[in-house]
């Protein structure tokens, strides 16, 4: 990231014979003031593995200087009527563990093919379920909320990953540690 004020970027290009060229660029950066709008992202909440599709269809959300990604997500979910439960804080170590909204889980219908996969993978069904919330350890031992930014799964909490103008963030529910949504890392 660039610091406020003058920044120097030095680049050395080398070919396979060892010849090189050095370039130096001075970049002046004027940082936005804390709380100033710096862009817009698109946020959605996907519960396809439960047969529910989008719990929150893609919507535009303003982002502000000094605000963590977790803060922007909480603001978007709460403005859509969700109650959020999480560990850590919006500033550090944030993990979204559960979202609540009246009737959110009433029409759960886990696809049969996914049930077969979970059974063959050896995951334990917990039997936990709440018609008014969806969260960690509901249905299976490997369930919970993960997220993608611009289609790529990210490591770490939402408080620790940067976002920028134009990014797309999708919260995705998994029943199998991400294996069922393409986000599993061994």
What residue spans do the PLM features occupy?
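Ubiquitin-like/PB1-type beta-grasp interaction modules and other compact soluble beta-rich domains
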Residues: 1-186
């Amino acid at each position: 990231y660039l610091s406020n004020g003058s920044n120097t970027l030095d680049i050395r290009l080398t070919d396979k014979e060892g010849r090189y060229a050095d370039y130096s660029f001075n970049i002046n950066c004027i940082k936005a003031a804390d709380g100033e709008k710096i862009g817009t992202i698109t946020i959605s909440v996907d519960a396809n593995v439960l047969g529910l599709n989008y719990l929150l269809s893609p919507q535009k959300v303003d982002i502000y200087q000094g605000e963590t990604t977790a803060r922007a997500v909480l603001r978007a979910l709460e403005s859509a009527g969700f109650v959020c439960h999480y560990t850590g804080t919006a500033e550090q170590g944030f993990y979204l563990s559960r979202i609540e909204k009246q009737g959110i889980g009433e029409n759960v219908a886990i696809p049969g093919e996914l049930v077969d996969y979970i059974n063959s993978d050896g995951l334990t069904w917990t039997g936990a379920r709440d018609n008014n919330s969806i969260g960690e350890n509901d249905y299976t031992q490997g369930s919970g909320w993960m997220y993608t930014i611009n289609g790529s799964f990210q490591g770490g909490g939402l408080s620790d990953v940067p976002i920028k103008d134009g990014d797309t963030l999708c919260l995705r529910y998994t029943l199998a540690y991400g294996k069922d949504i393409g986000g599993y890392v061994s």
